[in-house]
């Protein structure tokens, strides 16, 4: 188990009003599984992902990531946990446009102060894993959307994280690119990593080991035998 939420909830104070972004829930993210987090826009999906990614603190309950209690950590400790345990893949790729694919993938290693030679070797290995080594010198603008996302996945993998969090990783991609990206994420989960994918796209349901539905700030697990009408769930 890589992450555990015990009665975890998240609220925001806006003036005199309390906004409940996520009602308290119990949830475990298991090793070697691909967990899909589904629900409409504004349902609380991104809040849940932000909690798992140690980007925000819970306002209720206890959050454990890699057997460490997140509630008690300061910002420096959180940054260290994220850098060494978690890989992030974003909808907008978040590649640095003046840098080529290899330099983009090397960025997290530079933050860890890995020497240049070792960083290059590790970055090339990550690009090779996603089938993009032959495009290592390409700038983001020279790559298709699917190729940019594969570079983003390589960047998330390069530090060998235990948990990979993906926020709408297939949005705006064509069907072929969606299949490629999801097959790579499934392969990563089968290699022993925990993968969580936030989406509102029911086409991704078939790739999941587990499905968490978030609606109006409430999160519940959907059983496999309840997925036949997938399009009614989101």
Annotate each PLM feature:
Residues 211-224:
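H-loop (His-switch) and adjacent beta-strand-loop-beta switch element
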Residues 1-11, 221-234:
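ABC-family P-loop ATPase nucleotide-binding domain
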Residues 2-3, 8-25, 29-207, 211-214:
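ABC family nucleotide-binding domain
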């Amino acid at each position: 188990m890589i992450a555990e939420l015990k009665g975890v909830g998240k609220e925001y104070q806006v003036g005199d009003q309390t906004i409940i972004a996520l009602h308290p829930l119990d949830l475990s993210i298991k090793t070697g599984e691909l967990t899909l987090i589904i629900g409409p826009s504004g349902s609380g999906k991104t809040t849940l992902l932000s909690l798992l990614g140690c980007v925000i603190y819970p306002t209720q309950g206890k959050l454990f990531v890699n057997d460490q209690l997140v509630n008690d950590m300061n910002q420096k400790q959180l940054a260290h946990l994220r850098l060494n345990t978690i890989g992030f893949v974003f909808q907008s790729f978040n590649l640095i446009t003046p840098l080529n694919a290899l330099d983009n993938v090397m960025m997290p290693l530079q933050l860890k102060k890995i020497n240049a030679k070792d960083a290059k070797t590790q970055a090339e290995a990550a690009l090779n894993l996603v089938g993009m080594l032959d495009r290592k010198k390409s700038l983001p603008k020279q790559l298709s959307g699917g190729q940019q996302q594969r570079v983003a996945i390589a960047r998330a993998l390069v530090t060998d994280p235990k948990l990979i969090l993906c926020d709408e990783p297939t949005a705006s991609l064509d069907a072929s690119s969606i299949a490629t990206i999801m097959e790579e994420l499934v392969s990563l989960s089968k290699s022993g990593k925990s993968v969580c994918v936030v989406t509102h796209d029911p086409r991704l349901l078939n790739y999941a080991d587990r499905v968490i539905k978030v609606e109006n700030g409430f999160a519940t697990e959907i059983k496999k035998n309840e997925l036949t009408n997938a399009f009614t769930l989101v």
